[in-house]
């Protein structure tokens, strides 16, 4: 609980510049995963925006969290969904299904829109080597401010990464 922590000395000016009367929505359940050096890279089928996706392979680990995991998917005790159930969209909830993978050793950020674990490639072809699919995949160089090509989408639909906007507890604690 951070509600009793002191606010930034310029908090009032920051809030005023954004607009004190405007609604603020934030995701409390945007999970991400850091991968170790040498994380195996795999193919992910690009099923909706292949021409605006960065080509793989990608370092997607078996435990990659899907947006909402675990908070959203474990709130209902009757549901009893596992991470793999969520990855496969067993409950047919659909949605944005963002997934964020950070490779700090290679300085790369991988973001996926509608990531889904599957045993089939698009079009119903059996493809055991294709275990994941997504609508869009974006790779960002963490050592650069380079943007995606003009007009390209990304996992946030604006060509920008999501991860820089994720607020982490350790950042709050450090006062950043």
Map each language-model feature to its residues:
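Short, surface-exposed polybasic-aromatic patches that bind anionic ligands, especially phosphate groups
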Residues: 1-176
